[in-house]
Amino acid sequence: LGAIGFLGSDSPRHAERQRALVGRRLFTRCLLPHPERGWTTGELAEALEVPVQAVYRHLQWLRELGLLTEDFPGKADDPKRVRLWHHSLPRAWEGVELHARACLAGYHDAAQSLAGEYGAADATLPEGMLALEKEDHFDIELREVPPSGDAPAELLARLGEGVGYFSAHHYPIADSMPFRILDNCFLQRPDRAWTAEEVAAWAETTRPTAYRHINKLLSLGMLARCRAADGGPPASAFHLRGGSLATAWQAIETRVELVLDSYRRVVGELA
């Protein structure tokens, strides 16, 4: 539940805060022991020992994920009830996986189109650089974003928003700083290694701000770390993984598949 974002994004040491506690109880007291049952919000609140208002956010999140559905009896004195899709956690999770893969397939097509626009470097590493082996935490948020056009800027905006690199705070996306950093620094120059200071200078921003966007691209797997081969500066720099968007996206897809496989095994154990 923590890995898919349901319990929030705070540090694990805050795991007992109200949101996480209610989220875990929702599964351990209600959904897992009674997959065949539909629940009203009042019944859930009583089982979880919280006010009704504390249940709504969790239900909305799980409905958007595709894990829960609602039954409407159609009678005023018989309120709607929420339940697991197909009355089964494994089958409900199959639907979540299908949705994730459908999103991924659409973004695959966008990435392939963009790869033809941007081209590729002659080598997987920038000249004079060595790979800097450091495993960055993989963090991706797949969401469905409708197509807005076939222009490169529109495709890149959709791709980045679909994997969580761009957010609603960045509209218009094509004019935003994270867009310009990804586009101008890394996609248009797949042969070059950039330090955080160089990215900050180019984007006319602070080093911490540049690092925030670089770290997001690292967590997506879009960028890789490198250093000077001769042992001199830079000791730490960043480049487009594999020297092309096509290669970088392939690595992202592979990691998503591994994550989905691991989640499926956990769901099977819970069932």
Describe the residue ranges of each PLM region.
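A short, conserved structural fragment
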Residues: 63-74, 218-230
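Short, cationic-aromatic polyanion-contact patches
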Residues: 19-23, 73-98, 172-178, 228-254
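Short alpha-helical segments that sit at the start of domains
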Residues: 1-28, 141-183
